[in-house]
From Swiss-Prot:
Domain SH3, chain residue ranges per copy: 271-332
Compositionally biased tracts (Polar residues): 231-249
Subunit structure: Forms homo- and heterooligomeric complexes. Binds Hep, a dual specificity protein kinase in the JNK pathway, but not its downstream target bsk. The C-terminal region interacts with the kinesin light chain protein, Klc, and the C-terminal PTY motif of amyloid-beta protein precursor-like protein, Appl.
The protein, known as: JNK-interacting protein 1
Gene Ontology terms: cellular component: axon; axon cytoplasm
Organism: Drosophila melanogaster (Fruit fly)
Location in the cell: Cytoplasm
Homology family: Belongs to the JIP scaffold family.
Function: The JNK-interacting protein (JIP) group of scaffold proteins selectively mediates JNK signaling by aggregating specific components of the MAPK cascade to form a functional JNK signaling module. May function as a regulator of vesicle transport, through interactions with the JNK-signaling components and motor proteins.
MF term (GO), any: identical protein binding
UniProt keyword terms in alphabetical order: Cytoplasm, Developmental protein, SH3 domain
InterPro entries: JIP1_scaffold (IPR047178), PH-like_dom_sf (IPR011993), PTB/PI_dom (IPR006020), SH3-like_dom_sf (IPR036028), SH3_domain (IPR001452)
CDD domains reported in the protein's UniProt record: PTB_JIP, SH3_JIP1_like
GO BP terms, alphabetized: anterograde synaptic vesicle transport; axonal transport of mitochondrion; JNK cascade; regulation of JNK cascade; regulation of terminal button organization; retrograde synaptic vesicle transport
Length: 490
């Protein structure tokens, strides 16, 4: 059976009358379009294998059109079988196949018609004036051992009216189509300025989350993850973290930090006195923390129980929190074990004035003093901003902004200290908590005076701080005046 198939396959090649019949001329081949249909049944690369079942009229028109154009390299592959079969028609009219013995098995074509169509294509493409086709060339090309490269998969054509979705979001009306960009070789038709701006836009889209502030722990993207820590180091503080975590609204404002807890806004840094120095460098990791360098002058306003301090870095003018271990007191008393530590609480208030009183205690006495001083200033008293420092030793009023002002508007420098044993009473106004006053006694004469202050918020924390100082002072006084150690010794 194999011998008969071989003889049937090679019969059109070795019989010379078949060549004479096909090499008669170009005019005779135009009248036989069936040879072209038999040779290339799947010539259209984009059509499926089932396109061979279409009408003969469309196939005839395609076959005749192939004769009018220049001969090109064509490849036919059986996509349905997937066996890698390839039939190549080169520009010189030669036929190449990967597997000549399998080709007649998969394609139910007449071998004689195929060879006739191939020879007719060669003679008609040359206009009938070319030399006769040799048999040896055909037998070499039809050999089963002929090597041929596999045709690469054809990619879909780039649509010309399709624009990039990213360019559309970036204002893609100014950009061309994708086909024009590839045709111009990477945007040759686009101005360099537009291309550079386009690259920057792509960079911001891909890496925008690295520079954007929405990547912070307070952003909506982080909050959408669920139960995530906000990142504030004061969130677990026993004190009110809202007051200890001021948010900076505008970095270019004249006062870069909001008012502190129980104080007025910091208008000038000169009025603040440095209480601590930076001992180590501290790099902030959250919004409510401030940066510290070694030797920075720091005004510590409050120290929480979790060993975090709230204060102002006088070098940078920023207010926030920082660990207490990164700052040291200016007196360096912490290094002296014999010196007892003194707790100090500082508040920024507006000093309105002092009036003499007849009694040494009572809320009514403070209200009467406030009414008298506010009546002199009017409905909106301003006062002189100063720092009220509360400690176990006493109350200190400090204001160092006077010498730095102009001579015309120069105010007296305030630096007064009242020993706690001479302070008899302290209370805030029951109706308006912004006003507070404390009564002091003259050291040698039986006379009393009430000192009135005003804060931007409620002054209840100031009164409570004075009350705690009284308790500590009284405890020390009892231990000194009535020692209990002597009782156990006896």
């Amino acid at each position: 059976m194999a011998d008969s198939e071989f003889e049937e396959f090679h019969r059109p090649i070795f019989e010379p009358h078949t060549i004479a019949g096909f090499g008669s001329g170009a005019g005779s081949k135009k009248n036989n379009p069936h040879a072209f249909y038999s040779l290339i049944p799947n010539d259209d690369l984009e059509d499926s294998h089932s396109s061979k079942s279409d009408g003969d009229g469309s196939d005839q028109e395609d076959g005749i059109g192939l004769v009018d154009h220049e001969p090109k390299m064509r490849q036919v592959e059986d996509d349905e079988l997937g066996d890698g079969l390839k039939v190549t028609l080169s520009s010189d009219g030669s036929l190449d196949t990967n597997d000549s013995f399998n080709s007649h098995r998969h394609h139910p074509l007449n071998h004689q018609d195929a060879i006739g169509g191939f020879l007719g294509m060669d003679t008609s493409g040359l206009g009938g004036n070319s030399a006769p086709v040799t048999i040896g060339a055909s037998t070499d090309l039809l050999a089963p051992n002929t090597a041929a490269t596999r045709r690469r998969r054809k990619l879909p054509e780039i649509p010309k009216n399709k624009k990039s979705s990213i360019l559309h979001l970036l204002g893609g009306s100014n950009f061309g189509s994708l086909a024009d960009e590839f045709r111009n070789g990477g945007g040759g038709g686009i101005p360099p300025a537009v291309r550079s701006g386009q690259q920057r836009s792509f960079l911001s889209l891909k890496c925008g989350y690295l520079m954007d502030e929405d990547s912070s722990p307070d952003s909506e993207r982080m909050q959408s993850l669920g139960d995530v820590d906000s990142g504030h180091s004061t969130a677990h503080s026993p004190n009110d973290f809202k007051s200890m975590s001021p948010q900076i609204t505008s970095p270019v404002s004249q006062s870069p930090f909001p008012p502190p807890f129980g104080g007025v806004p910091f208008g000038q840094l000169e009025m603040l006195e440095a209480t601590h120095r930076g001992l180590h460098k501290f790099v902030p990791r959250h919004h409510d923390e401030i940066e510290l360098e070694i030797g920075d002058a720091i005004y510590v306003q409050k120290e929480a129980e979790d060993l975090w301090c709230e204060g102002v870095n006088l070098r940078t003018g920023r207010q926030g929190i920082f660990p207490s271990a990164y700052a040291v007191d200016l007196d360096y008393n912490e290094f002296d074990p014999t010196v007892q530590l003194v707790k100090k609480e500082r508040y920024l208030l507006g000093y309105l004035g002092s009036v003499e009183t007849l009694a040494h205690k009572g809320t009514g006495v403070v209200c009467q003093a406030v009414r008298k001083i506010v009546g002199e200033y009017g409905n909106s008293p301003t006062g002189q901003t100063c720092i009220l420092e509360v400690s176990d030793q006493g109350l200190r009023m400090v204001d160092r902004s006077g010498p730095n002002q102009n001579k015309k508007d120069k105010k007296p420098c305030i630096d007064y200290f009242y020993s706690l044993k001479n302070v008899s009473f302290c209370a805030f106004h029951p109706r308006d908590h912004r006003f507070i006053g404390f009564i002091t006694k003259h050291p040698t004469v039986q006379r009393f005076a009430c000192h009135v202050f005003k804060g931007s918020e409620s002054t209840r924390p100031v009164a409570e701080a004075v009350g705690r100082a009284f308790q500590r002072f009284y405890q020390k006084f009892i231990e000194t005046a009535y020692p209990i150690e002597d009782i156990y010794i006896e």
